Design a protein with these regions (language model features):
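N-terminal signal peptide c-region/cleavage motif recognized by signal peptidases
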Residues: 14-16
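Outer-membrane beta-barrel initiation region
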Residues: 18-57
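Repeated loop/turn-to-beta-strand initiation elements of outer-membrane beta-barrel proteins
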Residues: 23, 53-59, 95-98, 105, ...
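Transmembrane beta-strand segments that form the barrel wall of outer-membrane beta-barrel proteins
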Residues: 23-33, 65-77, 108-117, 148-154
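Solvent-exposed loop/turn segments connecting transmembrane beta-strands
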Residues: 32-42, 74-85, 99, 121-127, ...
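Outer-membrane beta-barrel "beta-signal"
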Residues: 43-47, 163-176
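Membrane-embedded beta-strands of outer-membrane beta-barrel proteins
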Residues: 45-49, 86-88, 134, 170
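Residue-level signature of outer-membrane beta-barrel architecture
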Residues: 49-53, 90-96, 138, 152, ...
């Protein structure tokens, strides 16, 4: 619990000098399975802070899709598991991505690594876990967003076992 409080105090402190980013609040289903295999479903609650700071620009100058930006967050499940995560994300307007004209839809893939404690939930095989997520969101007039995401948590075979877990979530995103 002490680790969680320290982590939250670091990501929730005021962000001096940051132009804009998003606080992301999500709720979903942890360990979603569609292949008929056994599942240990739980409710997944997530908070992320996405910073609008470019860490690395890996693409052509005219395309802002390749700006890697940082995020940090926490996920909690109804079976007492928690995951402290930090990583990078890309973000682009879907209209701009395909037609060159902005619209209200955004595409946000992300990759992170963090500390996982399984609580009474699914045993993922290691304390260090990686998460990849694909998200689509709709930007409202006030710049808030509503999104849906699909993610996968795995230890990338660095543990003795690697069952992984899929998560589908709905999110509300508020600019800060």
């Amino acid at each position: 619990m002490f680790r969680i409080l320290i982590f939250l105090s670091l990501i929730l402190k005021p962000s001096i000098g940051l132009s804009q980013g998003y606080d992301v609040f999500g709720i979903g289903i942890y360990d979603v399975k569609s292949d008929g295999s056994s599942s240990e479903n739980a409710t997944d609650v997530r908070y992320e802070r996405r910073f609008d700071i470019t860490l690395i620009d890996i693409g052509p100058e005219q395309d802002n899709f390749f700006y890697l930006k940082p995020f940090a967050g926490i996920e909690l499940t109804s079976d007492s598991a928690f995951y402290l995560i930090s990583g990078i994300y890309l973000e682009d307007n879907i209209g701009d991505l395909f037609s060159g004209k902005d619209n209200n839809w955004n595409f946000t893939p992300s990759f992170g690594v963090g500390y996982y404690d399984d609580g009474n939930g699914k045993k993922l095989g290691n304390k260090i876990e990686f998460r990849t997520t694909i998200e689509f969101s709709y930007q409202l007039i006030n710049k808030d967003r509503i999104g849906i995401s699909f993610g996968h948590i795995s230890n990338a075979n660095i543990g003795n076992k690697n069952p992984g877990a899929e998560i589908i979530s709905l999110s509300y995103q508020k600019p800060f």
